[in-house]
A protein has these predicted regions:
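Alpha-helical transmembrane segments
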Residues: 3-20
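A loop-to-helix transmembrane entry motif
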Residues: 14, 44-58
């Protein structure tokens, strides 16, 4: 039976982070009494973008990680890619919560996310060509 146990681990960790980001938006909406949009509030606008960025990049990375696992990737590579993805997403959140502008954590977080997506995309194509 084929399983996606390692992808499931990283999807679970990232799912918890995703819920945390959503709860942060709800908390800010309640505090500032804003139902839709950001209402001109920079804190809420930032929280919405942090959540949005996560929702934009994380699913593709997890799909590629799952494909890679199904294609027979080593546990070491799966942990390396999954761990780097989690680290990158956490750093991105920390960096954006630190400042709206550029920060080292934000830059490293996005570079890590891009690297994971690129490596997994190339590896999945490579495994297809070699099959």
């Amino acid at each position: 039976m084929v399983t996606l146990s390692l992808t499931g681990l990283y999807a679970g960790l990232l799912g918890i982070l995703y819920i945390g980001l959503a709860i942060n938006i709800i908390r800010l909406r309640l505090r500032f009494k804003i139902g839709i949009g950001a209402g001109g509030n920079e804190f809420l606008a930032k929280a919405i973008r942090v959540h949005g960025n996560f929702a934009e990049y994380t699913p593709m990375a997890l799909i590629l990680l799952g494909c890679y696992e199904l294609n027979g990737a080593s546990a070491m590579m799966l942990h390396a890619m999954g761990g780097l993805l989690v680290l990158g997403r956490v750093l991105h959140v920390v960096g954006l919560n630190k400042t709206i502008g550029a920060s080292k954590q934000r830059q490293i977080g996005m570079l890590s996310t891009f690297l994971v997506i690129l490596v997994l995309a190339i590896e999945n194509i490579r495994l297809f060509v070699l099959a």
